[in-house]
């Protein structure tokens, strides 16, 4: 789960959480890097540049000039993506290290699933696959019904939606005694 303020690493085995760790750095660190690298002096503008023009791989980026909002300055998109890729590599390598610490890194036969706002970075799955040697895909939430369904399909909300679906399943389960209450009936 590539969040703004942290990265959550979970390893599942046989449908159960086998390993769970949270790294205290997230994708918002990229905003600060862009802010510093290009002397923007406004983290919000840096975040907007990242969201609009950012990518995970410099090699995939077609170089062009990008105007920094509300200024007369331009930067090269290659330079912007270089800053973003450098930080993403650091963050992803930290997540990979945590997966290795779980003791079952080599057994990730089903690959790695990404979620969270950071999973929306163009090419993030290619970068993570390259760094980890595992297949990488994106988590999806099924059967979401809401007034604004399109916005709920964003990976930013997947953790919350997953928890809500689990809660819904728990509510639907019958609460009467379970199998043991019928064990002694004649």
Where are these regions (language model features)?
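Short glycine-aspartate micro-motif
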Residues: 1
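Short acidic, Gly/Ser-rich segments with clustered Asp/Glu that frequently serve as metal-coordination loops
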Residues: 4-8
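Helical "lid/coupling" subdomains associated with nucleotide-phosphate turnover
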Residues: 10-25, 29-45, 51, 55-186
């Amino acid at each position: 789960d590539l969040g703004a303020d942290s990265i959550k690493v979970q390893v599942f085995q046989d449908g159960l959480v086998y390993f769970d760790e949270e790294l205290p750095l997230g994708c918002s660190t990229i905003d600060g890097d862009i802010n510093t690298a290009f002397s923007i002096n406004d983290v919000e503008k840096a975040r907007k540049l990242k969201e609009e023009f950012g990518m995970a791989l410099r090699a995939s980026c077609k170089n062009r000039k990008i105007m920094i909002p509300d200024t007369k300055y331009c930067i090269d998109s290659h330079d912007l993506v270089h800053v973003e890729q450098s930080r993403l590599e650091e963050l992803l390598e930290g997540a990979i290290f945590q997966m290795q610490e779980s003791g079952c890194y080599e057994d990730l036969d089903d690959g790695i699933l990404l979620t969270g706002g950071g999973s929306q970075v163009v090419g993030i799955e290619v970068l993570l696959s390259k760094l980890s040697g595992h297949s990488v895909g994106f988590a999806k939430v099924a059967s979401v019904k809401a007034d604004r369904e399109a916005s709920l399909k964003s990976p930013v909300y997947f953790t919350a939606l997953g928890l809500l679906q689990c809660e819904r399943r728990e509510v639907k389960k019958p609460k009467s005694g379970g199998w043991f209450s019928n064990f002694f009936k004649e």
